[in-house]
Amino acid sequence: MGLGQGWGWEASCFACLIRSCCQVVTFTFPFGFQGISQSLENVSGYYADARLEVGSTQLRTAGSCSHSFKRSFLEKKRFTEEATKYFRERVSPVHLQILLTNNEAWKRFVTAAELPRDEADALYEALKKLRTYAAIEDEYVQQKDEQFREWFLKEFPQVKRKIQESIEKLRALANGIEEVHRGCTISNVVSSSTGAASGIMSLAGLVLAPFTAGTSLALTAAGVGLGAASAVTGITTSIVEHSYTSSAEAEASRLTATSIDRLKVFKEVMRDITPNLLSLLNNYYEATQTIGSEIRAIRQARARARLPVTTWRISAGSGGQAERTIAGTTRAVSRGARILSATTSGIFLALDVVNLVYESKHLHEGAKSASAEELRRQAQELEENLMELTQIYQRLNPCHTH
């Protein structure tokens, strides 16, 4: 074999491998090809970790390039296997046939799935083998699909009505919690104002006592009594709000758990009883988009699985809730301790002023309740899940008009 033939084959293979490692290599030799055809063992080209030996007609790679190439190959192979499994379990033979025989449908799928050319080609070849297996089970699958259609159309309207009722109750509970919270905030503002006034009266009585031969102590006594009444009012308000909120949250938890269980039944049926749900959809274009989106999700999940990620989740509004807890503790200490003694009127006056400023600011901002916001979030999630099932119901129902 002459140098031109051997070198052309080796260089072609080497260029392909180097491109797969994201590097482009150009070899420049200080001689031409025409006069060399006998002694091949000394003709070699080197670049980084790659080595091409013409004499032995062997192509070898070493180091990170080889490892990266092997890992990339295995990852693509695993993705193809997972995607094929999805098609076998979730996609009807009808849709599989359309994707494999209709170029436009396949292009839409590849675009929706965001597949590179090499992965799309590998998946296409795997699906061609799957098509033979799928055709054998097609008749059985159609029977299961029809059973699912009948069950879904019969059961879903009743479940939907119950879940909608739960969503409305959750929002009503959230509104109730917020109304009680706002009322208690107003009560706390009044109570803090009264506490501040009682502190001023008590302090004034003590200051004026030397100049009034003790008669001003009556003012102090009145301030103590007013402060005690303020403390009782504040404590009662806190008990009322806590009791109502706890009761509402318990009811909301029950409603949410029941609704989630009902939704879970339908999702499990969709996955286990009739995995070929897509064969029942009348809109083939939308079904193709759906399949593409699912395959894209599988591909992205594999990419994320290779990255170690630590997620720290901080609940929205947790800072404000902690701030309210601290302020509530301060308020409880202020009011509870006032009943015990009037000798520290100056300290209690300062605490009452702090409480008054905080509660007034909170009231001005709308007196939002973290518990109410959480219930609204749960209601929104239930509504979104219910909407997905409602869309499936509309597609399964031949009597439905868009």
From Swiss-Prot:
Induction behaviour: In vitro, is responsive to TNF.
**One record GO biological process:** lipoprotein metabolic process
One GO cellular component term? cytoplasm
Q: Where in the cell is it found?
A: Cytoplasm
Task: Provide this UniProt record's keywords sorted from A to Z.
Answer: Cytoplasm, Lipid transport, Transport
Primary site of residence: cytoplasm
Record's keyword annotation contains Transport? yes
Tissue-wise expression: Widely expressed; the highest levels are in prostate, lung and placenta; also detected in kidney, bone marrow, spleen, thymus, spinal cord, adrenal gland, salivary gland, trachea and mammary gland; levels are low in brain, heart, fetal liver, pancreas and testis.
Q: Which InterPro entries match?
A: ApoL
**Which GO MF terms are attached to this record?**
lipid binding; lipid transporter activity
Role of this protein = May affect the movement of lipids in the cytoplasm or allow the binding of lipids to organelles.
Family membership, please give it.
Belongs to the apolipoprotein L family.
Q: Know the name of this protein?
A: Apolipoprotein L3
Look up and give the organism this protein is from.
Answer: Homo sapiens (Human)
